[in-house]
């Protein structure tokens, strides 16, 4: 179709009378294209950032799940390790108790043997003295009888009878003296036996407390079991036992709900392995020396009854 060229005034008239409509330019400017390009780039970056954000969220979720699994695994491992340590502690405590029981049996057997030995020695001494006095009595009696024969049968018989009566009275006195002496020997040896037993016990306890560092923990546990009401607790121990007891502080608090507040201090007057526990209601003495005093008292009572 041939193109028709119009002058500008003619074009204006045609537009004016709506015979012609001038359309907008079909070509966009370079500036608009650049802006649209920038908008596209921004939208692309936003899309990429959204994808990266989603990836980070997914990664965070995976990390949280992995962390939860690790925490659960660690919890199980802690429970297993705690159970193992408790079993070890129980086994060690049983070993210590068994060793102490064996030592106590040995001490008792040694004490009985010592007592029987002393009784045997004292009986032998009494028998020896009795034999000596018996021989002397026989000799005196024979002399008296011989003398009586020399002075006449009748007179000698009476004299011999009187001498025999004197000898018998003397024999009764000697026997009473021997019985009293035997009783004195047994009473004096009883103290020696108790002293010997306690010396051996002290050596045994010292050897056990030196080799078994957690004896003090067993003592603390046993005392805390005897506390029935909620209270503030102060545990006093030897300096050598201070660290091991403080290390178990949280364990004591979790195991014994009677503890309102727990303090652990050093006391130079307490021997290794022992403790004194103070509460709002008084103190409980679990020192090794105090326990040995009770054992000594029981041995003394046993001796007196025997």
Curated annotation (Swiss-Prot):
PANTHER family recorded for this chain?
FLAGELLAR ASSEMBLY PROTEIN FLIH (PTHR34982:SF1), YOP PROTEINS TRANSLOCATION PROTEIN L (PTHR34982)
Q: Which Pfam families match?
A: FliH
Q: Which organism is it from?
A: Borreliella burgdorferi (strain ATCC 35210 / DSM 4680 / CIP 102532 / B31) (Borrelia burgdorferi)
What is the official name of this protein in its record? Flagellar assembly protein FliH
| UniProt keyword annotation of Transport present | yes
- What is the annotated role of this protein in its UniProt record? Needed for flagellar regrowth and assembly.
Top-level division of the source organism's lineage = Bacteria
Write out the similarity annotation. Belongs to the FliH family.
Any single GO BP term:
protein transport
Location comes to: Cytoplasm
Q: Which UniProt keywords apply?
A: Bacterial flagellum biogenesis, Bacterial flagellum protein export, Cytoplasm, Protein transport, Transport
Q: Name one GO cellular component term.
A: cytosol
């Amino acid at each position: 179709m041939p193109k028709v060229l119009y002058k500008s005034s003619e074009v204006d008239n045609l537009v004016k009378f709506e015979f012609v409509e001038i359309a907008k330019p079909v070509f966009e400017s370079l500036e608009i294209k650049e802006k649209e390009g920038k908008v596209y780039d921004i939208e692309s970056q936003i899309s990429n950032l959204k994808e990266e954000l989603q990836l980070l969220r997914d990664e965070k979720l995976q990390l949280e799940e992995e962390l939860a699994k690790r925490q659960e695994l660690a919890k199980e491992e802690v429970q297993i390790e705690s159970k193992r340590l408790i079993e070890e502690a129980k086994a060690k405590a049983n070993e210590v108790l068994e060793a102490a029981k064996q030592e106590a049996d040995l001490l008792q057997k040694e004490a009985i043997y010592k007592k029987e030995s002393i009784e045997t020695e004292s009986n032998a001494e009494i028998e020896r003295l009795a034999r000596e006095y018996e021989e002397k009595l026989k000799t005196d009696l024979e002399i008296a009888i011989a003398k009586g024969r020399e002075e006449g049968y009748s007179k000698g018989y009476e004299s011999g009878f009187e001498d025999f009566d004197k000898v018998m009275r003397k024999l009764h006195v000697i026997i009473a003296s021997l019985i009293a002496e035997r009783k004195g020997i047994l009473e004096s040896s009883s103290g020696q036996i108790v002293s010997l037993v306690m010396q051996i016990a002290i050596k045994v306890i010292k050897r056990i407390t030196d080799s078994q560092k957690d004896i003090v923990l067993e003592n603390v546990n046993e005392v805390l079991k005897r506390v029935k009401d909620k209270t503030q607790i102060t545990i006093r121990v030897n300096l050598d036992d201070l660290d091991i007891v403080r290390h178990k502080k949280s364990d004591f608090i979790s195991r014994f709900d009677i503890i309102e507040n727990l303090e652990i201090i050093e006391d130079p007057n307490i021997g290794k392995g022992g403790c004194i526990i103070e509460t709002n209601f008084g103190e409980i003495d679990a020192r090794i020396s105090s326990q040995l005093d009770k054992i000594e008292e029981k041995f003394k009572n046993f001796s007196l009854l025997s």
